[in-house]
Amino acid sequence: MKKYLSLLLACVLTLALRCAGGGKDAAEQTPAPETPPTQTAAAGGVDTSCKLYFPNDAVDDLHADTAQIPDAEPAVTTAYAQAITEQLIAHNALPKGSQVLAISKDGDALSLDLNEAFLAGLRESGSTGELMYMGSLVNTFLDNFNCTTVRVTVEGKPFSTGHSEYDKPLQAFTF
């Protein structure tokens, strides 16, 4: 019995150390290559390149890649924000059914209002899934809208998941 308790204690301590900073420091984190949004002419509109952040295979860090948003101008509009959201969903970086209800920018602060499907998926994802979803969402929107904070709401209200309260603006997630 003591053997099992010792093993359990060792696992809990390892997990606690990992969560408290045993991961990569911001200085050690591999920086994503700088790829500002670009526009290329396309038949029927403008294609915009945007940077997406999504979980790596080990689900312990975020990986950055670029995606093309067809027929979209990079602007603070619900349509452009939804196009980015759909790219994140396609990379399993946001819950299916997530939709942008509203977006606004005031200086370097972005406000993003999402639907109940986003919150339901977030609550079902567990603590690691929640961290990856929120990190993907926040880092992607910070990068593409050149902001320092994102306030995320659901149906216009702050929300909680059981793991975290989301009632304040969020800054970039680092792991």
Model-derived features with residue positions:
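Bimodal "functional hotspot" detector
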Residues: 2-13, 18-175
